[in-house]
Amino acid sequence: MTASRRTLMVMAGGTGGHVFPGLAVAHRMEAAGWRVVWLGNPAGMEATLVPKHGIPMEYVRFGGLRGKGLKTKLALPFNLLRACAQSLAALRRVRPDVVLGMGGYITFPAGVMTALSGRPLVLHEQNSIAGLANKVLAKLAKRVLVAFPGALPHAEWTGNPIRAELARTEPPKARYAARSGPLNVLVVGGSLGAAALNEVVPRALALLAPGERPRVVHQAGAKHIDALKANYEAAGFAAGDDVRLVPFIDDMAAAYAAADLVICRSGAMTVSEIAAVGVAALFVPFPYAVDDHQTTNAAFLADAGAAVLVQQRDLSAELLADWLRGQSRASLAAMAERSRSLAKPEATDEVARVCATVAGANLESLQ
């Protein structure tokens, strides 16, 4: 059977942390001549995003229990059986040679039915702490891949699949050496914004003398841009004071590459992207993440001296201002180089090769 006649089913949904790495692998497999079909939730972001990438979809309705009421919990057995039936029907329609599970609630019933139907399952865990579903599915999968070492026992450390442009960024040593003047700081609140960063960073900058202040690009989240502008104005900043406020950033590769320091949360993809580019980071983990996995994600780089980890409860304008005063471009460049050394820039190709191997395909098709 030739690669052009082989089919990969990607099952992923719910958040960008599951969907975007899945898309990276999907496009890599398509480039090698594979047919790709996506299994997702019709209510998830994947239902809108994935078709825009030209990938056909199959749907399974299934959600989590966290934060839900008694009615939803009592309906779990029925909903799980329905999701299993929908998953099996999709598998029979698509007849994939291999199924790649990238996370999200639907991965559990679909992964179980993949194994029960005799089709090979490859599992990828993006976070440093695996959820319950992946801990169960890992026992059923042919190969188990992780973004962070030790996330699952007996797993292969491949890193997180990322966008190709991030892996192609110029090495940090050359980037930092070419700069002079104030430090360039990128503050990333994510698509939803990070209120703690939006409140503390302006006040911290105000505590610095004008000659100590960095140039700042602060991404607020679309719903938070007006509040962020008010925070900077309250801290005494006006438009043009080396501070640029934006609701979102289209080209994150360029934004990371232009920064000496990134101040941000520590979701799995953010940590992986920062390492791939090679840029110094100050991580403030989201304190309500499941199993506090953002702290463990950040610790992967922080424990190696490749980033700094500050818990939100400890973050203050005074602490941040004092820390910024102690940084130089040289110290941040050293941090960036350590970060780059821990990256897995070939993660997308590696995950794709594992899928091909499990399906019995010729690896030459992925060269």
UniProtKB/Swiss-Prot annotation:
Gene coding for it: murG
Sequence similarity: Belongs to the glycosyltransferase 28 family. MurG subfamily.
KW Membrane (keyword) present: yes
Cellular-component GO terms for this entry: plasma membrane
The keyword Cell cycle is annotated on this UniProt entry: yes
GO function terms (MF aspect): UDP-N-acetyl-D-glucosamine:N-acetylmuramoyl-L-alanyl-D-glutamyl-meso-2,6-diaminopimelyl-D-alanyl-D-alanine-diphosphoundecaprenol 4-beta-N-acetylglucosaminlytransferase activity; undecaprenyldiphospho-muramoylpentapeptide beta-N-acetylglucosaminyltransferase activity
Protein name (database record): UDP-N-acetylglucosamine--N-acetylmuramyl-(pentapeptide) pyrophosphoryl-undecaprenol N-acetylglucosamine transferase
InterPro entries per UniProt: GlcNAc_MurG, Glyco_trans_28_C, GlycoTrans_28_N
Biological classification of the source: Bacteria, Pseudomonadati, Pseudomonadota, Betaproteobacteria, Burkholderiales
Binding site for UDP-N-acetyl-alpha-D-glucosamine: T15, G16, G17, N127, R163, S191, I249, Q294
Species name: Burkholderia multivorans (strain ATCC 17616 / 249)
